Design a protein with these regions (language model features):
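Cell-envelope/ECM-targeting effectors and their regulatory/trafficking segments
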Residues: 1-78
Length: 78
């Protein structure tokens, strides 16, 4: 499994941040990550909040379980 780690950059990180930003407007417990394309501290905090909401380990990294939860939430709430 591929994991998005702190400092990673690129289109996939941008997409993750975009989806988290959309969710942050609907759920006050998910902070906006800012959409920069770099998995920085604010992005990690947003991922950790999503992980908490889905009862996943809160590490701020995006693995398959976190990705699947993000996609599910985004599809339901976009």
């Amino acid at each position: 499994d591929y994991v998005i780690m702190p400092g990673d950059q690129g289109d996939l990180v941008y997409a993750i941040q975009f989806m988290l930003d959309v969710l942050s407007r609907k759920f006050s417990n998910i902070p906006s990550p800012g959409v920069t394309g770099t998995h920085n501290e604010s992005s990690q905090a947003s991922v950790s909040a999503l992980q908490h909401a889905f009862a996943l380990p809160e590490n701020g990294q995006v693995n398959k379980a976190t990705w699947d939860s993000l996609i599910t939430a985004y599809r339901v709430h976009q």
